[in-house]
């Protein structure tokens, strides 16, 4: 625990996780690490474990995430926290496993459009979760379909508190620009004159965007590069459903009240419980979600099986030699896993504040849905102590927050265990399996980056917005919106 500060050590169990858990299958992976389903060998309970590398002393966000999870264990609308362990410099956060995966998984793996009844049922439970969070002075700050997990019991649960905030008091407001670009509220990006920040109403805006995302399988403006989106959101009219007539007046009104550009005129989560659309969703919420999950699981299982077979076939062709995967002569930015050369203007990096490594999130002119937009952090405070970026730097950051990989996400459990589509690990211990998956992920990531660089054309398009980005930059050092005007 050498890299863990004293305050965080108190949160970590002294038990050996190798003796408690056995890895079953990978359900998510990214530059942050790996999320696996594991079985508790004591009580045979299946849990989800987030594996994170502990490097340096950047533990504040993890400490906050764990604190929030601990403080919300009694809420049925928030993913339950089971404990925290460290093994060989790897942090393991143990949480309940939701067998239906995320709402994003269901939409993408099953290629379905949710019905209005399903959307209402899900939104009701999300609102209940927000009521609990906001009453306890917690802002989620990253509400979206990818962060809502569901299970066969018909429960919808908020997850991923890596960028959440705990307010000091009821009147306290936040100033850090954080969240996923397409779901961010106008006041988070560009606080109105005279405003000292934003509060829980920012989550209500994200909820409205999530409602549209569930109805249309993508959030508004998803055709735009995320850099451009942060310039557009504060100055455009509030989004609506593309074809309002296809939906009920109650649903249209729900979106309208959530997406009021004046934050103080948006309803609170408590207010939304009395909205006709949410009251309609409450009536049959759990049966509706349960039926949806049961219907989708076979399709999702087949999707994952095929993906696992494809990956195994690719590995068989390439061989297991990983000696040269991180080689090459390109200069790397401090700790970066991507080259600073060859990236187009407008390229975004996601920065892992735990490992201080960067990977390409989305390049200019592309539309990559696999990362679901990423998570954006911009610190307006002058006392920023982050070691990965100086105050005033705009980055797309992991900060402990999971960016879902659509192709590798939440797998279902069959009676007696997992199906034959499970990922095959090298090594036998938890840590060895974690290291094995990191190698696989980094190998695929580097192959994708190499392919992207080969196909890259020297194009210059619309991302050079007012406010000015340095041509060829990969990390931007200006506020997303000029707030001094």
Curated annotation (Swiss-Prot):
| Entry keyword set | ATP-binding, Kinase, Magnesium, Metal-binding, Nucleotide-binding, Serine/threonine-protein kinase, Transferase
SMART domains per UniProt? S_TKc
Q: Is Kinase among this UniProt entry's keywords?
A: yes
Q: Give the UniProt entry's GO cellular component terms.
A: cytoplasm; nucleus
UniProt feature, compositional bias: Low complexity: 370-393
Chemical reaction(s) catalysed: L-seryl-[protein] + ATP = O-phospho-L-seryl-[protein] + ADP + H(+); L-threonyl-[protein] + ATP = O-phospho-L-threonyl-[protein] + ADP + H(+)
Task: Answer yes or no on keyword Kinase.
Answer: yes
InterPro entries, alphabetically? Kinase-like_dom_sf, Prot_kinase_dom, Protein_kinase_ATP_BS, Ser/Thr_kinase_AS, STE20/SPS1-PAK
Identification of the protein by name: Serine/threonine-protein kinase dst4
Source organism per UniProt: Dictyostelium discoideum
Q: What is the lineage of its organism?
A: Eukaryota, Amoebozoa, Evosea, Eumycetozoa, Dictyostelia
């Amino acid at each position: 625990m050498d890299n863990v500060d004293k305050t965080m050590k108190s949160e970590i169990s002294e038990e050996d996780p190798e003796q408690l858990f056995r890895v079953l299958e990978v359900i998510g992976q990214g530059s942050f690490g790996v999320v696996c389903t594991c079985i508790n060998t004591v009580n045979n309970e299946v849990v989800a474990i987030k594996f994170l590398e502990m490097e340096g002393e950047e533990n504040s966000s993890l400490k906050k995430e764990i604190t929030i999870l601990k403080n919300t264990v009694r809420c049925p609308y928030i993913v339950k926290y089971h404990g925290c362990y460290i093994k060989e410099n790897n942090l393991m956060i143990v949480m309940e496993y939701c067998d239906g995966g995320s709402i994003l998984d269901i939409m993408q793996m099953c290629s379905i459009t949710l019905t209005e009844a399903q959307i209402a049922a899900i939104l009701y439970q999300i609102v209940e979760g927000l009521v609990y969070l906001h009453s306890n002075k917690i802002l989620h700050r990253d509400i979206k379909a990818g962060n809502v997990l569901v299970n066969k019991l018909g429960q919808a649960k908020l997850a991923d508190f890596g960028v959440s905030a705990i307010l000091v008091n009821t009147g306290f407001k936040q100033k850090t620009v954080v969240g996923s670009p397409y779901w961010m509220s106008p006041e988070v990006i560009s606080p109105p004159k005279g405003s000292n920040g934003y509060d829980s109403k920012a989550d209500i805006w994200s909820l409205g965007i999530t409602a549209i995302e569930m109805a249309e399988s993508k959030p508004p403006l998803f055709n735009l590069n995320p850099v451009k989106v942060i310039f557009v959101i504060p100055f455009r009219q509030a989004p609506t459903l593309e074809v309002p007539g296809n939906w009920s007046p109650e649903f249209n009104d729900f979106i309208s009240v959530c997406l009021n550009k004046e934050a103080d005129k948006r309803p609170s989560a408590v207010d939304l419980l009395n909205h006709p659309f949410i009251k309609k969703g409450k009536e049959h919420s759990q049966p509706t979600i349960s039926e949806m999950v049961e219907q989708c699981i076979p399709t999702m299982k087949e999707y994952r099986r095929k993906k696992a077979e494809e990956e195994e076939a690719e590995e068989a062709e390439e061989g297991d030699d990983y000696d040269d995967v991180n080689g090459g002569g390109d200069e790397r930015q401090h700790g970066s896993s991507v080259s600073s050369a060859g990236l187009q203007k407008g390229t975004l990096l996601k920065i892992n504040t735990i490992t201080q490594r960067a990977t390409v999130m989305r390049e200019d002119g592309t539309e990559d849905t696999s990362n679901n937009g990423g998570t954006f952090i911009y610190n307006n405070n002058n006392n920023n102590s982050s070691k990965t970026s100086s105050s005033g730097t705009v980055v797309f950051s992991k900060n402990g927050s999971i960016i879902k990989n659509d192709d590798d996400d939440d797998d279902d459990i069959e009676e007696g265990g997992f199906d034959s589509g499970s990922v095959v690990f090298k090594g036998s211990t938890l840590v060895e399996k974690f290291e094995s998956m990191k190698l696989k992920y980094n190998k695929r990531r580097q192959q994708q980056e190499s392919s992207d660089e080969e196909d890259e054309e020297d194009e210059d398009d619309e991302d050079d917005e007012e406010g000015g980005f340095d041509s060829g930059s990969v990390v931007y050092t200006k506020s997303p919106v000029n707030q001094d005007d």
